[in-house]
């Protein structure tokens, strides 16, 4: 390892302990997107945060009081927001990729890439109603 690489490499003993908490999507239509994620993936609103210029809906799987969350963030002034190009998909582990793909499409998602087999997994992509890419994954044993 070069001196420069050694100097910039993170030190395990000083790195903070972290856990993943949430992904936040800024959305155009908060009510519509809430309905989509409820119907397509069974998420429920665990908490609503009313801010001066926006509302946040903290969504989780039904019955979960803690853990990873999807936060939908809607501006109150209905400003124009769009999905940019510098992002990757939100990955969702599912039991049956084909069934989850069909269900999401039936609930308003756009098919983006039909289910296929990859090494050790089955994968498909859909776009939510505002164009965000969602990757559906089922690991094979």
Where are these regions (language model features)?
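Acetyl-CoA-dependent GNAT
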Residues: 73-77, 138-140
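Core segments of cupin and vicinal oxygen chelate
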Residues: 17-18, 24-67
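Eukaryotic phosphotyrosine signaling hubs
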Residues: 20-21, 85-89
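Short, charged/polar, Gly/Pro-enriched secondary-structure boundary elements
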Residues: 64-69, 131-133
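Vicinal oxygen chelate
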Residues: 1-16, 22, 46-48, 92, ...
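Exposed loop/turn and edge beta-strand positions of beta-sandwich/beta-sheet ligand-binding modules
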Residues: 53, 86, 120
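Short amphipathic alpha-helices within nucleic acid-binding modules
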Residues: 33-36, 98-103
């Amino acid at each position: 390892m070069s001196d420069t690489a050694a100097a910039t490499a993170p030190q395990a003993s000083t790195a903070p302990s972290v856990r993943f908490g949430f992904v936040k999507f800024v959305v155009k239509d908060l009510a519509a997107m809430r309905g989509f994620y409820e119907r397509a993936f069974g998420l429920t609103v665990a908490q609503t945060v009313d801010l001066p210029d926006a509302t946040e809906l903290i969504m989780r799987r039904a019955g979960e009081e803690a853990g990873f969350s999807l936060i939908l963030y809607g501006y109150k002034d209905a400003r124009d927001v769009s999905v940019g190009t510098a992002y990757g998909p939100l990955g969702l582990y599912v039991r049956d990729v084909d069934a989850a793909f069909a269900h999401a499409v039936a609930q308003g998602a756009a098919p983006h890439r039909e289910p296929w087999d990859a090494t050790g997994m089955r994968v498909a992509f859909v776009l939510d109603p505002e164009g965000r890419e969602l990757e559906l994954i089922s690991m094979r044993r």
